[in-house]
Regions:
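Catalytic metal-binding acidic patch
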Residues: 30-62
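N-terminal, helix-rich and Lys/Arg-enriched segments in bacterial and organellar proteins
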Residues: 27, 40-42, 96, 102
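Generic structural hydrophobic/aromatic packing signal, biased to beta-strands
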Residues: 22-24, 41, 77
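Flexible, active-site-adjacent loop/turn segments at secondary-structure boundaries
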Residues: 26-28, 50-53, 72-75
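Helical scaffold of the NTase/Pol beta-like nucleotidyltransferase catalytic core
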Residues: 1-26
Length: 146
C-alpha cells in the first residue's frame, strides 16, 4: 500500500488551526502491517487564538476514518505528554514524520526532559496489560498489525 502523507488531512476534519506535526501511526509506523492493514495517522495542531477564546472552541482531539486519524490540539498534546502517555512520547523520538513545522524541533530538542518515572510507569502498565491479553488468548493488537 502506498502511503499518501497528507491523505488524512481532509476537509471533513474541520481543523481550525495549523498542523504542527504528523506521522504515520499504528502498524505501518513499526513495520508490522499485514497485507490488509489500513494506514493510521496522528498529529498535533495549533488552534487559532480567536477560536480558542471564542464561544465555540475547537475540539481538543479530532478523529476520523478512511483514512483513520487522531490529531490533538497542542494543549491536549502537552497534557498527555506531561502524563507520560507512551504514544505521545513516541512522537518526540520518531524520525519518521510526514509533516513537521520548524517549531516542533524546539520541543523535540527537550525530549529527554520528558522521560520521567511517570513515563516508565505508563510503559510498564501498558506491557502488563498486553501480557494479560495474551494470557487470556486475546490478540495484543485490535487490528492491522502482527
Amino acid at each position: 500500500m502506498e502511503l499518501n502523507p497528507l491523505a488524512w488531512k481532509s476537509d471533513k476534519m474541520n481543523m481550525r488551526g495549523w498542523l504542527l506535526f504528523s506521522k504515520v501511526w499504528g502498524s505501518f509506523s513499526h513495520d508490522t502491517q499485514l497485507p490488509g492493514s489500513d494506514v493510521d495517522y496522528t498529529g498535533v495542531y495549533v488552534a487559532h487564538q480567536k477560536d480558542l477564546l471564542g464561544l465555540h472552541p475547537p475540539g481538543d482531539t479530532l478523529t476520523g476514518e478512511k483514512p483513520d486519524y487522531q490529531i490533538h490540539e497542542v494543549k491536549k498534546f502537552c497534557d498527555l505528554l506531561l502524563k507520560g502517555n507512551p504514544a505521545i512520547i513516541e512522537m518526540l523520538f520518531t524520525d519518521r514524520f510526514i509533516w513537521c513545522e520548524p517549531k516542533w524541533f524546539s520541543l523535540r530538542e527537550a525530549r529527554a526532559r520528558f522521560l520521567t518515572q511517570n513515563v516508565v510507569k505508563q510503559y510498564l502498565g501498558y506491557s502488563v496489560a498486553q501480557l494479560q491479553r495474551l494470557r487470556h488468548g486475546k490478540p495484543v493488537h485490535s487490528k492491522g498489525g502482527v
